[in-house]
Amino acid sequence: AGRPFLLFLSLVFGLLSISGTGSCTTVVLGWSRDGLSAARIGVLTTGSGVAMLVGAAGATRLSRRVRGGVLLLAATAVTVSATAGLALVPSVPGRALLLVLLFCAAPIMNAVGGGYVMRLIPTGMFGRVGGALLLINLGLPAAAPWLAGRGLDAVGRSGTLWGFTALGSLALGLMLASRRLRTLGLPSQWDAADEAP
């Protein structure tokens, strides 16, 4: 049951990565289309970079104090809510703040999810299985910029953002359906989590 669950996790996190990366790309491309200067876009996205550093710095401390399942689902819910907000909020400052929220929660989600995946890979198969999972996790998000551009041309900014929100919502739903993820404990307890999703 180990390999199917690893594939399940890879799919879920791949969908979340497409959702977040695609939403951010859609917003930036939309700003460029609206005529915002490159300098202003750079300033607006600087907050996202700072937020990612803050989220990464807090991820380790939080993972030691909060159960993995709670932290993972909460961070994922925040990222999905932020992508939905990007579709609902039309203002430039509002979208910039939502990107900050998204990029603050994403490192927490990645830290718990990535750490758990690494724990599940058998030592003797780390190279082969890890390489396959890395291919999936890098390959799926690589499509996000293309999807964002095509979406903007086909259905506009709002429609594209709702599409990426739907992907994130699907991933969140899959996570909620997995008892193994919902009940995931602290990192010290991960070895005991052996039930299939």
Report each predicted region and the residues it spans.
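Pair of pore-lining "gating" transmembrane helices in MFS-fold secondary transporters
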Residues: 2-21, 100
